[in-house]
Amino acid sequence: MEARVAWGALAGPLRVLCVLCCLLGRAIAAPSPIIKFPGDVAPKTDKELAVQYLNTFYGCPKESCNLFVLKDTLKKMQKFFGLPQTGDLDQNTIETMRKPRCGNPDVANYNFFPRKPKWDKNQITYRIIGYTPDLDPETVDDAFARALKVWSDVTPLRFSRIHDGEADIMINFGRWEHGDGYPFDGKDGLLAHAFAPGTGVGGDSHFDDDELWTLGEGQVVRVKYGNADGEYCKFPFLFNGREYSSCTDTGRSDGFLWCSTTYNFEKDGKYGFCPHEALFTMGGNADGQPCKFPFRFQGTSYNSCTTEGRTDGYRWCGTTEDYDRDKKYGFCPETAMSTVGGNSEGAPCVFPFTFLGNKYESCTSAGRNDGKVWCATTTNYDDDRKWGFCPDQGYSLFLVAAHEFGHAMGLEHSQDPGALMAPIYTYTKNFRLSHDDIKGIQELYGPSPDADTDTGTGPTPTLGPVTPEICKQDIVFDGIAQIRGEIFFFKDRFIWRTVTPRDKPTGPLLVATFWPELPEKIDAVYEAPQEEKAVFFAGNEYWVYSASTLERGYPKPLTSLGLPPDVQQVDAAFNWSKNKKTYIFAGDKFWRYNEVKKKMDPGFPKLIADSWNAIPDNLDAVVDLQGGGHSYFFKGAYYLKLENQSLKSVKFGSIKSDWLGC
């Protein structure tokens, strides 16, 4: 019987390519020992990471960053990110330090921001000196143009591109030490940096080319030829009854990789060829002509792209049979099988490959203790020791560039986690410049002359979203849940987290930092404790995460849970420790879901009023603090505490005072 409580007064392919293999994560080999991969950067210890981090971003000198200075500087860092200011290297602090971020300091550094500089003109020029092979040039050009438009939309600044000479903002990609005295650090970690307005390097923006640059949702593949020339691959796509999440040579005898540019190739028949050096090259002096294999360079014959003769690690080829004679060359485009990092300079995966005597047909994490998936770039890793990481979602060049161009305009890092100018990278699908960003840039340059000057009550484009403050505002939370032992409060794209009720939660933090791919606003959330998976509801879909990884195949429609089609939104959900069943509330009804059988229990839905006496319809959240013996029902600014065994209501109280430490 459900609880009755008193609420009180209240308101078929031939081979599977790298990206698909990474997702499937299947390997033939047995577990292997952990090894040292050549060219891999060993992870730093927590202490090493902290000293370097605080030196780079908070000015703690390496030579004198001893225990006492370290503790004091740590408190500054923790304050900046809204963490408890303990001065200790606790788990939350280390997690924050390990997140990918901008290379500019959080405490103003003279070389980056001397005396709050700004441009003394509104017409700013930019020049793109180099390109990443991860994206075609048109996509890179568009990402940079859109990133600059983010700032011109809200200021009088206007940006124009030049192709020769010295521009105000010189844009380039580089690896490690790249000529400005501020080296990058390989894959992940530091993503980019930019200099404040000024002469020389002032305004220049540099991007780490050891990263995988995308638009934030995996590799961006623009096709050539076929019947969809210039369009983008649609992943996954359907061909012969099977979904493909990467380019494939299935159905072809020439070995060329292709993809569909719509989901259903069988229906639409739209396709193109994926980037490959046999189709075209980039840059160089050969006007895009394809590689010519074999080609001769310095007396040696090459049958594939090479990095020989270069110090920047970029793969190139001759476009005639004799480079020594003709001097014609181009850079090899990245394919949908290209690796990232490692020691193969972006060479593609080769399957199957041999590793420690075992054969692997797909990307694997064997040999590693960090869970990262990799592949060999020759048939035998044991002999050749050539490898690279398999592609992931990558980093949005548009978002990172928009952040860096904010620095190039004179903005420093923001402590507002919802701001574009916050130092940690977080992918946001439907990006909007925040109120904090707009206020900062307009303090330097003023508003755009094109802005709507209407003083009416309606929203204007320059206001931007404001990061909420839980103790200063009356916030109605979208969801509340205990996940991995922590209590999370959700509101729009922000979360606050705490271990114990009444303690003021840490935050706000961005939801996307913990659970990428979620929409900006959820309706409900709960943890399935049996599997330690977090389940989120938004609209007529739901998402399932293991830690921060979205389970394959999600989001799924609510109907796949057993909810009827007329349920288009869920109000609240929780797993009740009393019977290990999950309860899902929508409007005036609720359902009971069996996590073991993966289906709804018979006899539901039931009316909330018939089973949960005096609990109102349209709840905001329900939480069972596992092990605590109580469940909590939230609506508006108040909550009810229910004793699980006796089913008695034992407390009615304020969320602000009892849960938020206000």
From Swiss-Prot:
Residues 414-662 are annotated as: Required for inhibitor TIMP2 binding. Ca(2+) 4 binds at D478, D523, D571, D620. It catalyses: Cleavage of gelatin type I and collagen types IV, V, VII, X. Cleaves the collagen-like sequence Pro-Gln-Gly-|-Ile-Ala-Gly-Gln. Residues 1-29 form the signal peptide. It is an enzyme of class 3 (hydrolase). GO terms for molecular function: fibronectin binding; metalloendopeptidase activity; zinc ion binding. A motif (Cysteine switch) lies at residues 100-107. This is 72 kDa type IV collagenase. It comes from Mus musculus (Mouse).
